Amino acid sequence: MERQITWTNNGIGIIEAEKRQGTEPAFLAEEVVEKIAAFHSSVPGYAVTPLAELPARAKELGLENIFVKDESHRFGLNAFKGLGGVYAVSKVICEKLGLDLEKADFSQICSEENKEKIKDMVFITATDGNHGKGVAWAAKKFGCQAYVYMPKGTVESRVQAIRDVGATEVLVTDYFYDDTVRMANKRAEENGWTMVQDTAWEGYEKFRLISCRAIPHWRKKLWSSSRKKA
């Protein structure tokens, strides 16, 4: 008797809808993914992360093989979200500097001349952990400030991990996650900071040249990038 395997689709509605219509979303195009991968490879500390095989588990499930991408090695952050953080922060910075991220590499963006121009930029985000770590780490790389808000109940080890990568401030709020996001976004709007969030809502779906910029549209591109041998 065959075993039934229960699984959960981790796709996004718009992606699935476009696939059904026979078209691939533009942000998943091979040429787009290649450009993002090229940028990531220019970041100091970049290295291909290991791909582990689980043949025994695959055999149990009647599969040919199972592969697990070990992202704990990514930029020394013990998390894959440094990819999203550095890409989003770099995109915002390139807009300010008038650079094209598809043509610029990390060293060009991070030159001493450019760092002087962006030294007063401030990024803010809300996080349960790894997303905030990625944003704080990326902002620090460029000599910018990063404020990270975390929901109530966050354990101290997660707070300290974000402090350790260079966050300007890590604040554990009195709110749960959704209200913590709202709180961070409000502070971004009040201060003219850049909100870098991995949660989307109405009015926050793509980049706009306003005081509180939206990032999710770019971050979607990274899903494909991490699937490649990177």
Model-found features: residue ranges?
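PLP-dependent amino-acid enzyme catalytic core
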Residues: 1-230
